[in-house]
């Protein structure tokens, strides 16, 4: 059985709710959900260019967990872009992770 999720500290503000290809209604496309902690990992690791150790400390998680989140987020973003799918971003209420 998996361990319960540890409380994560999130600070990134999500600018919109989704990204999708132009000209195709989103109801006709496959949706991929990017979780709030994955979004935060992308922000800290790829935008702010923090080391995994520093970013993990800011989120209150282990470096290994941060690495898993970052890899998962990158895969979801790459899949959405290359396969023409909808990437759903976390809502503001998703930031209240426990």
UniProtKB/Swiss-Prot annotation:
Pfam family, one: DUF134
Family: Belongs to the UPF0251 family.
HAMAP family: UPF0251 (MF_00674)
Protein known as: UPF0251 protein Sputw3181_3483
């Amino acid at each position: 059985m998996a361990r319960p999720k540890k409380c994560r500290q999130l600070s990134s503000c999500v600018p919109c709710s989704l990204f999708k290809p132009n000209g195709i209604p989103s109801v006709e496309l496959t949706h991929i959900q990017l979780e709030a902690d994955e979004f935060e990992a992308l922000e800290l690791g790829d935008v702010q260019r923090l080391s995994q150790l520093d970013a993990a400390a800011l989120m209150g998680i282990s470096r290994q967990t941060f690495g898993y989140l970052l890899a998962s987020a990158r895969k979801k973003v790459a899949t959405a872009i290359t396969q023409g799918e909808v990437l759903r971003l976390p809502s503001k209420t998703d930031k209240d992770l426990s």
